[in-house]
Amino acid sequence: YAAAMHDYRFKEMEYTLPGEYLQEQEIERQRKIHDSLITMGLELISDCYLNVLGTQCSERGIELQRRMMDGKHHIELIKDIEAQSYDLTVMGVVGVGKTRASQIGSVCERVVRNCARDFWVVKHVPKERDVPRDTVLVAIDGSPQSFGALVRGIELAKRFDKRLEIISVYDPYLHYTVFNSIVDVLTEKAAKVFRFEEQNQLHEEVIDTGLAQIYQSHLNIAERMAEEREVEVSKTLLDGKAFHKILQRVEDDPPWVLILGRVGVHKLKDEDTGLGSTTENLLRMAPCD
């Protein structure tokens, strides 16, 4: 909770108070009253939230450690997560300030982007009549993070008796877009230096075919990893823009959970990107956890 923020905002609005409240002694008295009520009130509200969670944990035999912090939400959460050794942090994708147009709340976005930890972002809250979702879908691109996601996916599929599906997407179309965008601007001399026609043919005959083989090999390795842990798995290789194809897949048949690495195979060794573009797009747009 953010009692300090309320205190700051109250002081900003003091000049709007009626005249009888603008005397120095009266303003100071009102500040103390406001600070006491807000701090106490927010502590009570936070405690009530934890009481509800505590009851649910007790009913399921789960131990609960209660923690409350005063400060800017995402800042305090990041400090706490980085200071602890949590196996998993679970957050709702939006908070109480959501609107119909909200894709992701500011707290969720900032915490997930700035903490290099495992997160489960809850986006789907099942209703009583909903058909249960039964698939753990893992996206593989060959990066260490994606295979880390696979290990988590295998564990979840076994523990919760879910189907495991792995998906990989390669993009053979990007070079066509790039080549078409430069063909009209290259001078004859530049085209010769660049060996435009040879480069185009190289991509068509070698690189695009090679990409398909590379990503298929990632799927094959992932399949063996699952089978070694006695988990049945289905695998899918698609071509196109990664986030778009994965989004189409989860929109057509939403899984129980989609698991992704924070970053992908194109991350540079010393690059601190926060989240990769595919992960960030799907975090916003996928209709599933």
Please report, for each region that a protein language model flagged, where it lies by residue.
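Short alpha-helix boundary/capping motifs
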Residues: 47, 71, 101-102, 143, ...
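Active-site-proximal loop/turn and secondary-structure-junction residues that shape catalytic pockets
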Residues: 170, 239, 264
